[in-house]
C-alpha cells in the first residue's frame, strides 16, 4: 500500500470527523480490498498464523514437544478458518490505522472510557516513582492509543523509537503527528538514537520499543514461534545498562474499547558478560511476545517476512545474518 502525505491528511480528516458507525464499515471494505490485491502480504500472514496454530508449514507438521508458546484458545482451526483469519488480520490492520488517526480528536474522558487493563501496576508504579520503563511491544492492536492514554490520563511521559520512512515528507508528517498531536517524544532511529533513548529513560519516560521485527539486520538470534530469526537487542541492552524494568506489553482492540496487558518485568539482572545477557533477555522477550500474540493472533500486524523460511517462500534473498551463521558454523567445524 503506497502512502503519501496527501492520502494520510485526507484519511486523518475522515477518521476525525466521521462517526465510528460510518468510518469502520468504510475501513473494513478498504482493508478487504487491500488484502485481496496483496499476495505477498497474504502469504506472510498465512505463514505466521500456521506457526501460531501449529498447522502444517512448508509440508512439515510441527512437533508439539518443541512448542514454546500456548496455542490460541480457538485452536485447532481448519484450512477454511485459517483463510478467514487472514482476512481478519487485514481488518485489524485497517482498524489500527483508523484508531491511530482518530486519536487527536478524542478528549481525555472519551479515551479513558475506552480503556481497561491488567498488570498495569508493573508499568505505572515505577513510572509514577520517576523511574524509566522499557515497554517491549509487538506490531499489535493499537499501541499509540495506550501511549496517548498514559500521557493524558496519568501524565506519564512516553517516548518511542520510530523507523525512517520514504519519502522524507512522509516521515516528517509522522513525526509531527506523533509529537504534536499525540504528545509523544519521538526518537528517529539513527546514529544518535541510543543516546536519546537512554536520556528519555533517565528522565523517567516509558520507552515504547517495537520488538517483534529486526528492521536493521543486526539483531539478536532467537527462537520465535518455532524458527530461528533475529529480534532487536535494543530493549534488552537499554534495560541491562540502565536498570530500568523491561515489561512486555500488548494493547488489544475489543469492540469499541482497548485492553492493555502488561506482563511482569523480565529478569534484567546481570548474570554474566553483557553480550550473553542481551541474548538471554532478548530470548525472554521473544517468549513473552509469543504469549501476548497468542491471545489474539489476528491482531498481529506483521506483513513483511519475519523468518528465513518466509524469505525463501517469497523467492527473496536470505537475510545477511543467516549466511553469517552458516559461515561461522563452517569455520568452527
Where are the regions a protein language model picked out?
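Short, flexible loop segments at the rims of nucleotide/cofactor-binding pockets, characterized by
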Residues: 109-115, 164, 183-188, 225-226, ...
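Active-site metal-coordination segments of metallo-dependent hydrolases
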Residues: 42-44, 165-168, 229-232
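A conditional alpha-helix N-cap/helix-loop micro-motif detector
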Residues: 113-117, 140, 167-168, 187-191, ...
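Short Gly/charged-rich anion-binding patches and loops
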Residues: 44, 121, 145, 174, ...
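Membrane-anchoring hydrophobic helices of lipid-metabolizing enzymes
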Residues: 1-137, 173-177, 181, 330-331
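Conserved beta-strand termini and adjacent loop/short-helix elements that scaffold enzyme active sites
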Residues: 118-120, 161-163, 187-191, 263-265, ...
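Catalytic core of membrane glycerolipid acyltransferases/transacylases, capturing the structured
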Residues: 88, 129-190, 217-220
